[in-house]
């Protein structure tokens, strides 16, 4: 029964597949929006109308990519598929809640799209700062619809987080300790804890904004004793952990991919990797105000947030060097997934380096809200999170589908994407250092060259996305079945064959420690 299987599903594999399909679809929408942005900025002068329309596109691009592409694919897709298989659990702890978590996302997405359709759209940027997001500068229902959309996506993530935490803690075989679970399982659990602690703060902030807009409260209005800076604190207390939520599952996937294709039976420094992720998770909560260096904070406050932010580089460095140590002395197989992982390690490190630059409050005063910041977070997202997703996808595709991708196409796809994203985002560092501000649809002629280069790069990335669609079609059309998977004793998820049966681990697994 199609309806029973796909709409009322309680199977972690089916729900994971739904998440992957939804995320892929949302990714197409987000990519289309990003190309609209780059088309507008390809040359000076106006292309798509006024700055309001431009900012609606920018805002939608951010929300779609974060809440409907990266999070559903990484946590919902890979998390649902792999976590139960990796710990030998029959399913997630709360299978029906798992289904609800997924089905909250399409309505949420619908509300976000609706916000662009009514009035002038929500041209607030993804941060939704008042007073721009207030009912004076944004009259009409657009921002309210965006807020409701975020509420639904937030509830979905909170329920998913509860589910993953419960599953990882309670559904392991009796003999398996927490320190014997694979790193991807750890990364998803830590991500879930971050979601559980940060999302309620966002919910509070946007609910206060909702009442400010509609019920005459003045939480963020100085005229009634409120303060717009309060909103920024609430938002970024969520917003900073959020960026670690987006990258941590990627860390977990990269650990698995690097270990597997180095022919190793375990990653280098397992405990160090776990503690590094826990440290990143903890530190992620105490650095939020580095997004607010320009609002006039006390010098001591700025000194603290600068130092605390730089300390995050230490556990991150532990992870990077542990990946390199895992590669060391290995029998390296240059598969497409390994190329994505190596690309991730290099480009994520470059993104982290520009992050260290921006952590300096004095430098950030100059660079805040310029394209330098855009370049920084797109290096860690577009070449961190997305490369991890791509690597994870080509690595686990045979597990999900039972078919193999064409190796040559996959390598060509990687090469095109690698050139495209670097050509898009590297020039943005130069634009930022020259003072080009973010969120403007037009710019002085002096910035033309690097903007043109950046826009050409974005179209190269588009061809890579189209090639990936072809590649997936080719795999399903050719139906090359999986012959053999190596290293299954240390990669539990492959144990049941490709694809695994509908129900796995129906009896508790016997784990010999």
From Swiss-Prot:
Binding site for Na(+): 40, 45, 441
Keywords tagged on the record: Calcium, Copper, Electron transport, Heme, Iron, Magnesium, Membrane, Metal-binding, Mitochondrion, Mitochondrion inner membrane, Respiratory chain, Sodium, Translocase, Transmembrane, Transmembrane helix, Transport
Highest rank taxon of the organism: Eukaryota
Major localization listed first in the record, in broad terms: mitochondrion
Involved pathway(s): Energy metabolism; oxidative phosphorylation
Crosslink (1'-histidyl-3'-tyrosine (His-Tyr)) position: 240-244
Catalysed reactions, semicolon-separated: 4 Fe(II)-[cytochrome c] + O2 + 8 H(+)(in) = 4 Fe(III)-[cytochrome c] + 2 H2O + 4 H(+)(out)
Residues that bind Mg(2+): 368-369
Pfam families linked to this entry: COX1 (PF00115)
InterPro entries, per the entry: Cyt_c_oxase-like_su1_dom, Cyt_c_oxase-like_su1_sf, Cyt_C_Oxase_1, Cyt_c_Oxase_su1_BS, Cyt_c_oxase_su1_dom
Molecular-function annotations in GO: cytochrome-c oxidase activity; heme binding; metal ion binding
Chain residues that bind heme a3: 376
Topological domain ranges for the Mitochondrial matrix compartment: 1-11, 87-94, 171-182, 262-269, 328-335, 401-406, 479-513
Regions crossing the membrane: 12-40, 51-86, 95-117, 141-170, 183-212, 228-261, 270-286, 299-327, 336-357, 371-400, 407-433, 447-478
Annotated GO biological process: electron transport coupled proton transport; mitochondrial electron transport, cytochrome c to oxygen
Cellular component, GO, one term: respiratory chain complex IV
The protein's required cofactors: heme; Cu cation
Protein name: Cytochrome c oxidase subunit 1
């Amino acid at each position: 029964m199609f309806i029973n299987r796909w709409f009322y599903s309680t199977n972690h594999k089916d729900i994971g597949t739904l998440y992957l399909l939804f995320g892929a679809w949302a990714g197409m929408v987000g990519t289309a929006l990003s190309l609209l942005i780059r088309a507008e900025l390809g040359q000076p002068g106006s292309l798509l109308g006024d700055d309001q329309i431009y900012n609606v596109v920018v805002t939608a691009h951010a929300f779609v990519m974060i809440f409907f592409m990266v999070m559903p694919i990484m946590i919902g897709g890979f998390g649902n598929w792999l976590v139960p298989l990796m710990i030998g659990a029959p399913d997630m702890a709360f299978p029906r809640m798992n289904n609800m978590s997924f089905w909250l996302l399409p309505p949420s997405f619908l509300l976000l799209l609706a916000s662009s359709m009514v009035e002038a759209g929500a041209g607030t940027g993804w941060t939704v700062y008042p007073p721009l997001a207030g009912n004076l500068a944004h009259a009409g229902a657009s921002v309210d619809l965006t807020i409701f959309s975020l509420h639904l996506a937030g509830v979905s993530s909170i329920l998913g987080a509860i589910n993953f935490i419960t599953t990882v803690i309670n559904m392991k075989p009796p003999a398996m300790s927490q320190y014997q679970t694979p790193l991807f399982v750890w990364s998803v659990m830590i991500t879930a804890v971050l979601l559980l602690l940060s999302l309620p703060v966002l919910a509070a902030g946007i609910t206060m904004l909702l009442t400010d807009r509609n019920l005459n409260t003045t939480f963020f209005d100085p005229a009634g004793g409120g303060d717009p800076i309060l909103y920024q604190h609430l938002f970024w207390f969520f917003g900073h952990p959020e960026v670690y939520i987006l990258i941590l599952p990627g860390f977990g996937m990269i650990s698995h991919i690097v270990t597997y294709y180095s022919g190793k039976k375990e990653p280098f420094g397992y405990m160090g990797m776990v503690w590094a992720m826990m440290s990143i998770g903890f530190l992620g909560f105490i650095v939020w105000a580095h997004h607010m260096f320009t609002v006039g904070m006390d010098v001591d406050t700025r000194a603290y947030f600068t130092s605390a932010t730089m300390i995050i580089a230490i556990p991150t460095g532990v992870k990077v060097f542990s990946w390199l140590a895992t590669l060391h002395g290995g029998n390296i197989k240059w598969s497409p997934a390994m190329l994505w992982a190596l690309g991730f390690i290099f480009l994520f490190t470059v993104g982290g380096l520009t992050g260290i630059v921006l952590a300096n409050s004095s430098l950030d005063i100059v660079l805040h809200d310029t394209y330098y910041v855009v370049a920084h977070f797109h290096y860690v997202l577009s070449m961190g999170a997305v490369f991890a997703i791509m690597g994870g996808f080509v690595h686990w595709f045979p597990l999900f589908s039972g078919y193999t991708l064409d190796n040559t196409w996959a390598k060509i796809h990687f090469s095109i994407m690698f050139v495209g994203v670097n050509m898009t985002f590297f020039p943005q560092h130069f634009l930022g250092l020259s003072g080009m501000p973010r969120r403007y649809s037009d710019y002085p002629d002096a910035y033309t060259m690097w903007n043109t280069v950046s826009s050409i790069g974005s179209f190269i990335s588009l061809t890579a996305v189209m090639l990936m669609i072809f590649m997936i079609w080719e795999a399903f059309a050719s139906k090359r079945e999986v012959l053999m998977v190596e290293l299954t004793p240390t990669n539990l998820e492959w144990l049941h064959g490709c694809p695994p049966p509908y129900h796995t681990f129906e009896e508790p697994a016997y784990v010999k420690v």
